[in-house]
């Protein structure tokens, strides 16, 4: 039986969105759509991240108010370099329609600021569809 997959561009801005003390706010929220998704299937979020270089836990990620994983840090990395990361999620987390993605700022354990500022860009959701 063939498997069908679709992709949703959640956010695709060249410079990315800034999250943290210097950002818009410490939680970035955006709506994306996964019409026809297979609830028993698999999905993953893919994004590029830059500047998340401090110590401590990464940035918390939620879809539809459910924790799905963390954006991992790259301690000591060059803050000018972009890194690709993915978070695997269950198709059951996604709605057959509008979904809410939340990315929380990561705590800064080694500086004066409350958060470790970072940028996200090229955010995609790949998901299985009902054939």
Which residues make up each language-model segment?
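Beta-strand-rich recognition domains
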Residues: 1-131
């Amino acid at each position: 039986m063939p498997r069908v997959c679709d992709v949703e561009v959640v956010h695709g801005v060249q410079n990315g969105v800034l999250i943290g003390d210097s950002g818009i706010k410490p939680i970035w929220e955006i709506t994306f759509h996964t019409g026809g998704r297979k609830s028993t299937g698999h999905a993953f979020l893919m994004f590029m991240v830059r500047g998340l270089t401090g110590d401590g836990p990464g940035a918390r990620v939620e879809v539809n108010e459910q924790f799905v994983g963390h954006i991992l840090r790259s301690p000591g990395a060059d803050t000018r370099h972009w890194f690709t990361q993915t978070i695997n999620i269950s198709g059951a987390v996604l709605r057959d329609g509008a979904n809410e993605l939340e990315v929380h700022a990561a705590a800064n354990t080694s500086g004066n600021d409350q958060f470790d500022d970072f940028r996200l860009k090229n955010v995609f959701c790949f998901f299985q569809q009902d054939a």
